[in-house]
């Protein structure tokens, strides 16, 4: 693929992601405000907690998608359709295994809901219904539209974005209407969540069939085909540890907050995390569209071009992060006051800690390059990151509450993400060929 085509597709991915980012961010804020006003802060806290528990089950995905994406760069670059079919068949087989593990784990977890939600004042069916609907919605991706990875690896992620984010826009609008105008609004909210998720999965499958008419995958043959592609299993095993660290970073803080406080504080923290999540999603929308392009660049093997592009990305992302953090510092509390009320504003010290977290997350340039090279062998790093995160969050949270919990998260990010990962990338690249290896065959 020539540089112009790569740049064009990257820009199209970025533009599409940015468009839907703005639309869905606005709708997410409106939806959350409507949720609080019409259903109450505790229902919102319950929904957040159920999402975090589901995130725990999603660890079972093990990073298979990232491993598959890495192994698809070369056959797509070489236009090897047979290899693409076989690799995605392996993915389908692995995803079915993951789905069964998630279902089993969910069945076990449900028995503990009376203990997990014993402080909740809502009827217990709220917890069961919320969790089951979110679980089924998540399972659609494992059974129906797992093949979207081909579009993403082929730098056509904008088509996935149109379908998924367009469907999410429709979902937000329908859920807002249901909560505001219908009795038993939360029941309709859950029905819409499930129905739209199913429609999105089916629509995406139609797009994939139209775009890749030659893509014929057979998950039932995945068990045999995986022996031809040991790289997938190797990378998946390595990525498992990285997935755990990512889960700990994104999902455990609300659970620890709930353990020390209440669903109300979880929801207040969630309000700020919606803003922060919106900012980080904005940065990712601008830059993650380049991920397949970086993989394609690595496949070319031009060391000087890769190094030059890396430092350009560093400069741009640090500039972006600085401006965004300053803007957040000046505007966030005023916005929260207007949005949901002054009683939902966090203390200034807590807010400063959240800004430090935002800056570190928004400057993670190395992640895209590590993914393109498939360098996941530092399995001790995410294990240590998760250990520091959980251990320090629990310990510091006991003494300093929410500030201590966020401080534990920041400490783990500083040591592993800010210090180790850039060093690991440059050290590893210095001792390896700058070409994407072909997937080995037996």
Residue ranges and their predicted role:
Residues 62-78, 153, 212-217, 276-314, ...:
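Helix-loop junctions and terminal segments of transmembrane helices
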